[in-house]
Amino acid sequence: MAGLEDTTDLRLPSASEPIKNIVLVGRTGNGKSATGNSLIGKQVFRSETRATGVTMKCETCVAVTPCGTGINVIDTPGLFDLSVSAEYLSQEIINCLVLAEDGLHAVVLVLSVRTRISQEEEATLNTLQVIFGSQIIDYLVVLFTGGDELEANNMTLDDYLSKGCPEFLKTVLRLCGGRRILFDNRTTDEGKKVKQVQELLAHVAAIEKSTSGIPFTDEMHRKIQKEAETLREQQKEVESKDLAAAEIEKWKKHYQTEHDKNMNMMAEMLGNRLREDSERQEKMLLALRDNLEISQRQNKLNELTDNEPDLIHCGVSLRRMPCNML
C-alpha cells in the first residue's frame, strides 16, 4: 500500500514551502492511481486494469515535482461508486481529511475519455457538495485520462468535449472556471510527463490565487485538526512527566482510544448525512418518474379528447341523413 512510508527515497519538500495537498476523486477505473503515479513521478500507487478498484483505502505520498513544488497526493478508492455504502464512504472521507490536515489545495475529479461519462460521475459532484458544501467547486480541477487515445485519433481535448459533452459536465466546467487538463499516463516521453504535471500545478496555482492562498477547510475538517492537535498535546504532556515506560504507554493508548472514538463519531454523523441525502435523491427520482408517467397519461388523454369531436360529428351526420340515402 502506498503511503508516507513510501516516500523515503523521494526528495522531501523544504519546510519553508508549504506542501500542496491534492486529492484525486472519481469512479473506479478512470485512472486515479495512474494519475497519482504520474504526479509523483514514480510507481507508488497500485494501478491495474480491472473491473474492481485496486485502491481500497485512502493512500498518500509526498514528493517534490521536477519544478520544485512539494505535493502531497492523496489517492482515494472508488469513494463515489454507486455500490459504496455510506458507512465506508464516510470513514474514508475522514481518513482523507486526516491525510490533508492543513486543508485541500485542489480536488481533482478524474474522468476517462475511454469510457462514457455515467451517473456515477454526476453523483460524485453531488456527494462532494453534500459533504463539503458548494465552496468545494472553487478548488475543483477536471482531469481526463486517456490522452494517448485522443492523440492516436488526432483529437484534442476540446475536440472530444465538442462531441456530445453531457450537460452535467458542461455545468461542472462552467462552475470551476473551465479548469480542465488531459493526461497521458502511459507516455514514456519525459518531457511530456513534466509538461502535464506543470499544467496541473498551474491550475493549482490559479486556485490559490483566486482563494487568496487559503486551502479548503470546513467545520468537519477543523474538528479533525483540533482532534489531532489535542492528541499531540496529550501525548507530549505524558512524555514530559516522570513516569515509567509502561505507564506512559498506558496513557498514550488511553488518549489514542479517545481520539479514535471521537473520529468514529464524526464518521457516523457524516454517514447519517450521506444516507439522508441518498434518501432525498431517491425520493426526487421517484417523484420525477411519477410526474413523467402522469404527463404521458395526460398527453394520451388529450390526444383522445382532440379526436372526439370529429367522431361525434360523424355520428350526428349519419343520424340526420334521409333513410333513402342510408
UniProtKB/Swiss-Prot annotation:
Which residue intervals make up region (G3)?
Answer: 75-78
Name what induces it: Up-regulated by brassinolides. Down-regulated by 2-aminoethoxyvinylglycine (AVG), high CO(2), isoxaben, and propiconazole treatments.
Record has Glycoprotein as a keyword:
no
Q: What ranges does the record give for the region G4, renumbered to this chain? A: 145-148
Name residues in a coiled coil.
Answer: 217-241
Which intervals hold domain AIG1-type G? 17-225
Is the keyword GTP-binding in the record?
A: yes
Which InterPro entries does this entry report, sorted A to Z?
A: G_AIG1, GIMA/IAN/Toc, P-loop_NTPase
Q: Which residues bind GTP?
A: 26-34, 47, 185
Segments for region (G1): 26-33
| Region (G2) location | 53-57
GO terms for cellular component: endoplasmic reticulum; plasma membrane
**Region (G5) residue spans:** 184-186
User: Which molecular-function annotation in GO is an example for this chain?
Assistant: GTP binding
Q: Which family does it belong to?
A: Belongs to the TRAFAC class TrmE-Era-EngA-EngB-Septin-like GTPase superfamily. AIG1/Toc34/Toc159-like paraseptin GTPase family. IAN subfamily.
PANTHER family assigned: AIG1-LIKE PROTEIN_ 48352-49494-RELATED (PTHR10903:SF146), GTPASE, IMAP FAMILY MEMBER-RELATED (PTHR10903)
| Record's protein name | Immune-associated nucleotide-binding protein 4
Q: What taxonomic lineage is listed for the species of origin?
A: Eukaryota, Viridiplantae, Streptophyta, Embryophyta, Tracheophyta
State the encoding gene: IAN4
